[in-house]
Structures are given as structure tokens and as C-alpha cells.
Amino acid sequence: MRIIGGEWRGRKIEEPRGRDVTRPTTDRVREACASMVMSAFDFDLDEVRVLDAFGGSGALGIEMLSRGARSLITFEIDRNAARLITKNIESLCRDRSRWRVVTGDVLASASRGRVPGGPFDLVLLDPPYAFGAAPVEELLRNLAQQGLLAPGAFALFEHAASDAGAHPAGFETVREKRYGITSVDLLRWVAADECDHANDSDIDEDVPLEDTHE
């Protein structure tokens, strides 16, 4: 697998091995996702804080870093996959203050407000297709309620085209695209005034979560 665009364009990253460990996004869909994000932020990610909620291969979050995102927090529940994401980012980005990989359940962490690096301007949501929209809606609600979303934050949700997209309260659907068996929805949080944004934590906040290091 290679990085498609940005500073590290053409650089190789490793993919997790074994069936059912992750479902890496295809190059075509990854490029489409990146284009949607770049357009949403007027092609400038310099101040964008990214949460990759279901890291998987980590490729989509790495694409955002490559294209200039200010910071990236990646959650991945599978320990081996999280280690590989860490290895991949370490091979590309020497600035350790820009990223963090957390081995853990993002749903549980968000419900307790224990997600470092927020408030986020962009949330990447690429869970296993069997996951469904309901947990994604719950995650976005919790992120909003815990002050972990910046005003006007975007969320990018990749899901099976045969399944319904996510429609959590307080979000509007900006764009929907279909690529074969995959659909990608871009959502925007429009209810910022209803939530308290006091939790403006730094990326190295002392949060009792498990970081992954090689």
C-alpha cells in the first residue's frame, strides 16, 4: 500500500496481515475521501485536528497527516494492528508531537470523555462494515457532548453501500458518494452552541490510555 498524496506521496506503508483483521480502504475510495476532506477545508489542513476512530490499516489518517493535518489521534482496538499503525507513522513522521496511536475502544473512551487531542475538526469513521450506523451515531453524539468536537467539525463515514448512513442529531449531511459496494458520507456538526467546548486538551495530555510503541 502507498500514500496517495501530500508530503509522503508514493511512500509505502505496511498492511495488517490475516483475514478479518482490518478491511483496508481501496486506493480509489481513499483518494475520494481525501478529496472530499480537502474540499471541505478549502485545501488547507494546517490547523485541522484529526481523530481516526477506527484505525484499521491507519492509511486514511496517515493520508491526512501527509496532506498537512496539524495532528492525528488514531484509535485501534486490535493490538497488532495498532502496533503496525505506529510503525508506519514512525517511518514517515519524525515529529512525535503530531500524532498518537491508542490501543483501545473509542466508543468507551468517548463516552467518558477520555479521548486525547481534542477538540477535533475532523473525525474519520471507517469501522468494519458489520458495525452499522447506530454505534457511529452514538460515538458522534458522545464526542459532541464531551466537548471533543470543534465548532463546524466534519465527520467522514465509510460504510457498505447497501446499509443506511449515519444521521445523528446535530449533524447535517454535506455530501454522499457511492463507489461500487462502498458509500462515503461527509457530515458536518451544526449544533456547536448546544455543547460545552471546555475540553481543549493538548495531544500529549496525561490521559490513562494505552499508547502503542514499537
Q: Where on the chain are the PLM-derived regions?
A:
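Class I S-adenosyl-L-methionine-dependent methyltransferase catalytic core
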Residues: 1-214
